[in-house]
Amino acid sequence: MANNNVYSVLKSLLLLLHLVFLSKQHVDSASIVKFLPGFEGPLPFELETGYIGVGEEEEVQLFYYFIKSERNPKEDPLLLWLTGGPGCSAISGLLYQNGPLAMKLDVYNGTLPSLVSTTYSWTKTSSMIFLDQPVGTGFSYSRTQLFNKPSDTGEAKRIHEFLQKWLGKHQEFSSNPFYVGGDSYSGLVVPATVQEISKGNCQCCNRPINLQGYVLGNPLTDCVYDCNYRVPFAHKMALISDELYESLKRTCRGEYVNVHPHDTECLKFVEEFNKLTNRVCERHILHSCCETETPSCYSYRFMLTTYWANDETVRKALQINKESIGEWTRCYRGIPYNHDIKSSVPYHMNNSIDGYRSLIYSGDHDIQVPFLGTQAWIRSLNYSIIDDWRPWMIKDQIAGYTTSYVNKMTFATVTGGGHTAEFTPKETFMMFQRWINGQPL
């Protein structure tokens, strides 16, 4: 009887160990993807997808897409790209902004939407990791209930942990120059992540990451600048009259958000401003705010991507864990999230002091994060200019304007650009290529 009990206990322990072993099989998993449903033929680049577990028990499973540089992956820079949001999937970067694939904008007929190659992918010159973060974004998920909700500063730590583990499993890239990039809301998280990596590099027990700098497009940085400068931007772009602009300046004194409820005169003019601009497409003021879903509508690609990413053959090809999520959504707004970084300006200051390069660029037709606000917070850093405001060119054509500073920061506008890179793919690619190669714009 005793022997039977011992046998039963041993059997239970072996079963438990087996289950633990199986549970670890999807942790830190990686798969090479050679074909993707919707794309004709083999992929013309090397794609890897997988999960990296972070947290004390690796309960958070972060999903990534990794694409090797199409030029020289052994030596080219490695760029981690963080999509804004928070809660917007890395597919936004991969299929809309600076990746090697895009949705083919055909009328949806019930079949799987098609993918096409892009001409100006940043993977032409760098290896790229597109990361679904925070947890709950894209295909990332948690195996247990989280007691600490994600936050800006918390994400910086999780991303740092992700990178340490990812590079531990891809040691052939550990010596490559490493950069962090992103756009929109990532303007808060990326500088904090850079600082977190920099601090980690100084600690004895961490494997150093070959961090060189960061790149940000139309980055949300501080609402004091980003939000308040929407008014002068609208005036410069002829969206509001001279008279209204002067009235706003006089009554609001540069403070156009969180106006005191007793300041009725300022509120009156802010309301008039909102009425004049509420039908303007925020991400690009020259684009239409579509009311119908047609291929000519900017947001049509979002619908196509939703059909594509929720197709079972696509999920199988990407090796998506069935535990991950139900329906994939491009931007999941239901993530409990603590917005604990109100301004990333101090992080920029610290990163500059630590000697990291930075490229800050602005599409000049974005009213969400207008270039005027970005210029204002850069001025607040009070760095000396080494290359004053000048045009940067592509084949004798003005592609934008740029200024360089002694702290290794470069600011550039992109003429005709919007909130993200896809509005001007050639210009943003050429700008990035020159900067990442250490060339002047």
From Swiss-Prot:
One GO-annotated biological process of the protein: proteolysis
One CC-aspect GO term: extracellular region
Annotated signal sequence range: 1-29
The keyword Transferase belongs to this UniProt entry's keyword annotation: no
InterPro entries per record: AB_hydrolase_fold (IPR029058), Peptidase_S10 (IPR001563)
Tissue: Ubiquitous.
Active site: 184, 366, 419
Molecular function, one GO term: serine-type carboxypeptidase activity
Pfam family, one: Peptidase_S10
UniProt-listed Gene3D superfamilies: alpha/beta hydrolase
Domain of life: Eukaryota
Sites where a glycan is attached: 109, 350, 382
UniProt keywords, alphabetically: Carboxypeptidase, Disulfide bond, Glycoprotein, Hydrolase, Protease, Secreted, Signal
Family in the record: Belongs to the peptidase S10 family.
Record's protein name: Serine carboxypeptidase-like 4
Organism of provenance: Arabidopsis thaliana (Mouse-ear cress)
Gene that encodes the chain: SCPL4
